[in-house]
From Swiss-Prot:
Family membership: Belongs to the IF-1 family.
Record's function text: One of the essential components for the initiation of protein synthesis. Stabilizes the binding of IF-2 and IF-3 on the 30S subunit to which N-formylmethionyl-tRNA(fMet) subsequently binds. Helps modulate mRNA selection, yielding the 30S pre-initiation complex (PIC). Upon addition of the 50S ribosomal subunit IF-1, IF-2 and IF-3 are released leaving the mature 70S translation initiation complex.
Record-level Gene Ontology MF annotations: ribosome binding; rRNA binding; translation initiation factor activity
Subcellular location: Cytoplasm
Keyword Cytoplasm included in the entry's annotation: yes
GO CC term (a single one): cytosol
Official protein name in the record: Translation initiation factor IF-1
Domain (S1-like) ranges: 1-72
PROSITE patterns: S1_IF1_TYPE
Protein's UniProt keywords contain Transferase: no
Main location: cytoplasm
Gene source species: Buchnera aphidicola subsp. Acyrthosiphon pisum (strain APS) (Acyrthosiphon pisum symbiotic bacterium)
Oligomer and partners: Component of the 30S ribosomal translation pre-initiation complex which assembles on the 30S ribosome in the order IF-2 and IF-3, IF-1 and N-formylmethionyl-tRNA(fMet); mRNA recruitment can occur at any time during PIC assembly.
SUPFAM superfamilies referenced in this protein's UniProt entry, alphabetically: Nucleic acid-binding proteins
Amino acid sequence: MSKEENIEMQGVVIDTLPNTMFRVELENKHIVTAHISGKMRKNYIRILTGDKVTVELTPYDLTKGRIIFRSR
């Protein structure tokens, strides 16, 4: 699957789950479960409740995503 097929959306972290999973509320008020991308995990980027993040979704399953960027 190529990068062009993924959907990027902005959201806010509303809950922290075990195993570096997060519940994120997107701009369109949908709630998805997201995990941290490998580069963020490698660089020890900390994500807390209330952080604004960019989530990458696949068109096949819109309930799961990957956090690829944390805004300040």
